Amino acid sequence: MELDVFAGQEKSELSMIEVARAILETRGRDKEMYFNDLVNEIQNYLEKSDADIRSSLPFFYSDLNTDGSFIPLGDNKWGLRSWYAIDEIDEEVITLEDIDENAPKRKNKKVNAFMDGDEDAIDYNDDDPEDENFTPSSAILEYDNDNEDDENAEVESYDSELNEIIPDDDLDDVELSEEDDDDDDDYEDETND
């Protein structure tokens, strides 16, 4: 078998993936090949031994999967992606309709690197089962139900505690007067300069 694409090139310099592409292109559209047949054709063209092909087979298969120009067609058949229109390619597509909105959502499990598989250790990052039922509406505190008498009692007890620290009689004796402060004058002098 001769491939016109590689005329004038040494076969030892060609990669298996290049030869596979050329073989499939010469066969034409809708002439996909089984993987084993493709490898045999490549081996015959490159004139490589069985041992050489076996050693490079994993790399070739990886290249075949990652190269964007090849497409697996099922049953270990391979073809060129250019042979098929986008509409013909049967790939799994997840749409919003496929997602069940009522399905229970799974929580991501946090991994604690410091636990070391100790089953007796307490994982404080574990969620409390009561937290799962927590809703913001249950957290709203109602202040309207407070008793005004309780509030007045609190204010009176606070006032009595303050009176213990400073009696009301002493507050009347304190005179507030404005002192002359030299620092204020110094500040005014600095700002006027």
From Swiss-Prot:
UniProt name for this protein: Probable DNA-directed RNA polymerase subunit delta
Disulphide bond pairs: none
Self-association state and partner proteins as the record states: RNAP is composed of a core of 2 alpha, a beta and a beta' subunits. The core is associated with a delta subunit and one of several sigma factors.
Region (Disordered): 119-193
Record-annotated HTH HARE-type domain positions: 14-83
Family: Belongs to the RpoE family.
GO CC terms, sorted: DNA-directed RNA polymerase complex
Taxon lineage: Bacteria, Bacillati, Bacillota, Bacilli, Lactobacillales
Record InterPro entries: Asxl_HARE-HTH, RNAP_delta_N_dom_sf, RpoE
GO BP field: DNA-templated transcription; regulation of DNA-templated transcription
Pfam families per the UniProt record, alphabetical: HARE-HTH
The protein's role, per its UniProt record: Participates in both the initiation and recycling phases of transcription. In the presence of the delta subunit, RNAP displays an increased specificity of transcription, a decreased affinity for nucleic acids, and an increased efficiency of RNA synthesis because of enhanced recycling.
Keywords: DNA-directed RNA polymerase, Nucleotidyltransferase, Transcription, Transferase
Signal peptide feature range: none
The keyword Glycoprotein is annotated on this UniProt entry: no
Single annotated GO MF: DNA-directed RNA polymerase activity
Residue stretches of biased makeup (Acidic residues): 119-133, 143-193
